[in-house]
Amino acid sequence: MIELIKHNLEGLTEKEFSYYEEINDLFNKEVFKNPKFNLLQLSAMLDYRALNTSKLIKHIYGMSFMTLVNLYRINYFDNQIRNYLSNGIKFNISQEIKESGFNNRTYFYDYFKKFMGKSPKEYYNL
């Protein structure tokens, strides 16, 4: 996982820690790959108010919900591309962007550069 994701669990109540575990489980099930995935959907899955979910994510991860989602999407994309490159598999970068949950290529490139420090072409030497 990209090193930018921290987990600050200090001061969480037992209930909040339970929500944290549920959030991790959902993200491990790759709910972020749905381009329409949003805070209201996550909150409904948790049966927790959206405002509280947002505050909990900010406390635990030190970032907004959408930044966290996009970080997971970039990480998924990175893992896929690394797998393809190491196995000599051809891929379509636009398809992989969509598969990662991004429905806007420009938005993807902005986040990729923000998190990885380079464009995908530079990062993977494509």
Which residues does each predicted region cover?
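Key DNA-contact positions within bacterial/archaeal DNA-binding proteins
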Residues: 51, 105-106
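Membrane-proximal linker segments that couple transmembrane helices to downstream signaling/catalytic modules
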Residues: 1-95, 100, 111
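Short, Lys/Arg-enriched C-terminal cap helix and immediately downstream tail that follows
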Residues: 64-66, 118-125
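Generic structural signal for short, solvent-exposed loop/turn connectors between secondary structure elements
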Residues: 33, 125-126
